[in-house]
Amino acid sequence: GTYAVANALPGEYPLVKDIKAKVYGAGKGNLADESRIGSVYWNRGLGAAVMWIEGLRNAQKMHNKVGKAVNGAEFRDGYEAINMTEARLNELGVGGMLAPFAISCANHEGAGKFAVMQWDGSKFNQVTGWEAPLDPAFIRGLVESSAAKFAKENNITPKKC
């Protein structure tokens, strides 16, 4: 079968190898089936963690709170300043696992790209590069329409960017 992924590809990326060695190698991991480390599902969680930590780092730098807690508004500022270039992804040890992306006040969607993987009977293999959707304006319209409906139903005033 095939699988389109929009967030993380499976594999033994440098950060995955470091976690295996330093966490699981030291007996501190809690995953019962360690063969799942580096799987598409495990790497989805790792990709999310990388993004949240990058947002936190940004927030701490922006608000002169390095090493200290930030509040929700400060974290949002840091999240909206995420710029995961190919160079930054490589520096973090996840180059190739995620498509490069940037977040802003007006765009929390990320890369907006996907890759197709195919199952070979034992594992998924990437069979395309990171591809853009055929009609990003249509998708953006769906996102904005859904967000406006949610805001109205929940009496939320959307933030102006």
Report residues per predicted region.
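Extracellular/periplasmic periplasmic-binding protein-like sensory domains
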Residues: 1-49, 131-135, 145-146, 157-158
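Segments of small-molecule ligand-sensing domains
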Residues: 33-42, 53-128, 133, 156-160
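A short, hydrophobic/aromatic-rich structural module that often spans a beta strand
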Residues: 105-111, 136-147
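Short, surface-exposed secondary-structure junctions/capping segments
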Residues: 140-161
